[in-house]
């Protein structure tokens, strides 16, 4: 009898040990990144950190972007104010930071990786109208915070990095900070790491008061950072790090200097040199091999430079074409040339400069304004055989320009001229979003570049080509189609228009074939 009891107790002991180990293995590690100001580079920090953690540890890494604004998503946001709207594979229209995440991590994100106040409120109000709260008074705490946590826990990954957009202490972000405080309690401190990014202004010397005050705001909410990343114009002195360590209660080794770099692709190397990802790995006690780190930017000597002109509607906004800019940089790396982008407002084009550049790109842009300059840029590219790529609306304008100046037919898009007698492009009613399959003609440049008859590309447009006029395209060919025209070419020169957005799928290690071949032709 005693032996049986011992055997039973032994079995229960090992069974419980097994359960604990399984729970430990499956528990995600959560890293929350907040900021004392908007625009400090939280997205870049998250992307660099995620990439390093993915490289150095045998763990999956995902990122969530929290935007405190009341918009449900970024679809109606003005690019002049907010930058580009980045489209995911599933058609979700998101903040441009998700594009940075995809490029740095080389993964495809979904709608679950983006959380906004508007999205959370919409879910809560829909649930309330359906009676799912059983007559309870619906409140920010616990219902809003619970919904935020529910969305966070939907992401299944070994490591989950959460970027809290906006500014700590603002009315909009306060409730999210409360939700993240609750997250820390639910998962345990050993599975939670707080990173706070603060700006250090320079007035004769670096000032640390702004950092001290923003950390104090976090503490008032019951949440304090484990790491402080300091954004500054120039390299920090050791005494400044020590001062921040003493006043903010963070180890001096966890005070990170993130001073200005030539471009964002140098940031990951700078952070690695300061043992930032290494210290986070040690904080979580994760097995890692630090020798596996490789910078995102290839270490090559590039001496050749080429000028590529982007003629667009939003060129005065530095982030309106961020994915396009990055795609050209990646293509330059692959072809070993420095791509110098000439930004040209479509309302004020410089024809002399257009004749001197190595390639011209007309990107997308909703609305009927600022058209004439784009049409003229397309005409110059076509007539002078300057390599040309028209993206989305740029493709539509390439067709309109060709009809006008080659076929001598004054057609238009109903977006530009609703009462046009020759509607070359008409409204599809619903916005076409996300990944779509496209079939390529085998005797085309597109097929040569993609090396495949079937491709998938991301879309964001409402207007499509009117196939009634297809047979009039004398000298211009439609070489890619879905249920509408997707790609147009002019044989004999590098002239291509695409209805989709190739820039959303270009990565540092997987340069999109259109940008790769455009830069190869231009150099």
Segments from the language model and where they lie:
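N-terminal amphipathic/basic-hydrophobic helices that include classical n-h-c signal peptides
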Residues: 1-26
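Flexible phosphate-sensing "switch/lid" loops adjacent to ATP/NTP-binding sites
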Residues: 28-337, 347-353, 359, 366-367, ...
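Active-site proximal loops enriched in glycine and acidic residues that flank catalytic Cys/His/Asp
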Residues: 35, 65, 232, 259, ...
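Cysteine-nucleophile active-site neighborhood
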Residues: 47, 51-52, 353-445, 500, ...
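Short, flexible, solvent-exposed loop/turn segments with mixed acidic/basic and small polar residues
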Residues: 216-221, 426-429, 447-453
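Acidic/polar loop patches that form or flank catalytic/metal-binding clefts of enzymes
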Residues: 227, 288-292, 389-390, 400, ...
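A structural signal for short secondary-structure junctions
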Residues: 302-303, 335-337, 353-356, 382, ...
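C-terminal and late-domain segments of enzyme folds
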Residues: 326, 442-523
């Amino acid at each position: 009898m005693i032996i049986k009891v011992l055997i039973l107790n032994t079995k229960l002991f090992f069974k419980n040990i097994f359960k604990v180990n399984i729970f430990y293995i499956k528990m995600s590690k959560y890293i929350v990144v907040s900021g004392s100001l908007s625009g400090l580079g939280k997205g870049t920090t998250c992307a660099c950190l995620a990439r390093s953690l993915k490289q150095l540890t045998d763990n999956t890494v995902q990122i969530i972007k929290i935007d405190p604004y009341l918009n449900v998503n970024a679809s109606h946001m003005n690019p002049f104010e907010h930058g580009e709207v980045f489209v995911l594979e599933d058609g979700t229209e998101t903040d441009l930071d998700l594009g940075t995440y995809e490029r740095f991590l080389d993964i495809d994100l979904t709608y679950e990786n983006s959380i906004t106040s508007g999205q959370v409120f919409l879910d809560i109000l829909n649930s309330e109208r359906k009676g799912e709260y059983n007559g309870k008074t619906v409140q920010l705490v616990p219902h809003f915070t619970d919904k935020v946590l529910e969305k966070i826990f939907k992401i299944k990954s070994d490591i989950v990095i959460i970027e809290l957009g906006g500014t700590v202490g603002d009315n909009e972000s306060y409730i999210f900070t409360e939700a993240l405080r609750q997250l820390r309690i639910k998962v345990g401190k050993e599975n939670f790491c707080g990173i706070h990014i603060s700006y250090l202004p320079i007035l004769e010397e670096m000032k640390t008061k702004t950092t001290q005050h923003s950390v104090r705001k976090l503490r008032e909410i019951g949440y304090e950072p484990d790491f402080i990343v300091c954004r500054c114009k120039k390299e920090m002195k050791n005494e400044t790090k020590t001062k921040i360590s003493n006043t903010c209660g963070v180890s001096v080794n966890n005070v990170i200097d993130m001073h200005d770099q030539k471009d964002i692709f140098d940031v990951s190397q700078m952070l690695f040199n300061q043992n930032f990802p290494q210290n986070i790995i040690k904080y979580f006690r994760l097995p890692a091999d630090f020798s596996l780190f490789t910078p995102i930017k290839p270490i090559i000597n590039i001496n050749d430079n080429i000028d590529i002109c982007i003629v667009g509607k939003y060129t005065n906004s530095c982030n309106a074409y961020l994915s396009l800019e990055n795609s050209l940089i990646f293509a330059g790396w692959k072809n070993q040339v420095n791509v110098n982008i000439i930004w040209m407002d479509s309302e004020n084009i410089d024809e002399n400069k257009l004749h001197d550049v190595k390639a011209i790109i007309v990107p997308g842009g909703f609305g009927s304004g600022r058209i004439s300059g784009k049409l003229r840029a397309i005409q110059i590219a076509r007539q002078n055989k300057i390599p040309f790529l028209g993206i989305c609306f740029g493709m539509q304008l390439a067709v309109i320009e060709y009809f006008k100046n080659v076929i001598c037919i004054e057609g238009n898009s109903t977006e530009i001229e609703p009462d046009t007698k020759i509607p070359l492009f008409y409204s599809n009613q619903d916005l076409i979003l996300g990944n779509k399959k496209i079939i390529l003609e085998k005797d085309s440049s597109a097929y040569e570049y993609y090396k495949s008859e079937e491709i998938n590309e991301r879309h964001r447009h409402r207007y499509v080509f009117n196939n009634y006029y297809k047979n009039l395209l004398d000298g211009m060919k439609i070489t890619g189609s879905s249920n509408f025209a997707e790609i147009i070419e002019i044989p004999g020169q590098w002239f291509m228009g695409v209805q989709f957005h190739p820039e959303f799928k270009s990565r540092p290690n997987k340069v999109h074939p259109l940008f790769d071949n455009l830069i190869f032709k231009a150099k």
